[in-house]
């Protein structure tokens, strides 16, 4: 995923990506903080969601894409400094749905954990993006 405009926007970096697994990171900057100077939950959510997609992406066949169906996230600790590190693993990959887990850390401290389901499909010819 060398061309990922959203990842570029938030400053997300790929550390490792292979079929069923990914690691990514984000250096905490002022733009990631809420008014209380804590990393906004949406930043952590975006890191987990992107990590899940990165873990699933290499398992896709030509012409297939994936899209988030749902994600459940638990936030364990407030984050004021970083960097944030996310490890994501595909737990189950079926023909049309995959279940993926992300764990987000600051150092060795687990600050959030997410579980998501992703649709796997071939897009229709109109109105949907294809696999890059």
Where are these regions (language model features)?
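Terminal targeting signals and extreme-terminal segments of soluble enzymes
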Residues: 1-132
């Amino acid at each position: 995923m060398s061309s990922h405009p959203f990842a570029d926007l938030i400053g997300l970096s790929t550390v490792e990506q292979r079929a069923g697994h990914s690691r990514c990171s984000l250096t905490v900057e002022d733009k990631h903080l809420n008014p209380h100077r804590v990393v906004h939950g949406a930043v952590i959510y975006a890191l987990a969601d992107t990590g899940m997609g990165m873990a699933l992406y290499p398992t896709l066949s030509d012409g297939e894409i994936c899209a988030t169906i749902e994600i459940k996230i638990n936030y364990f600790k407030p984050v004021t400094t970083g960097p944030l590190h996310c490890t994501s693993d595909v737990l189950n990959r079926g023909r049309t749905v995959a279940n993926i887990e992300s764990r987000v850390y600051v150092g060795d401290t687990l600050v959030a954990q997410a579980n998501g389901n992703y649709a796997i499909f071939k897009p229709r010819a109109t109105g949907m993006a294809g696999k890059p």
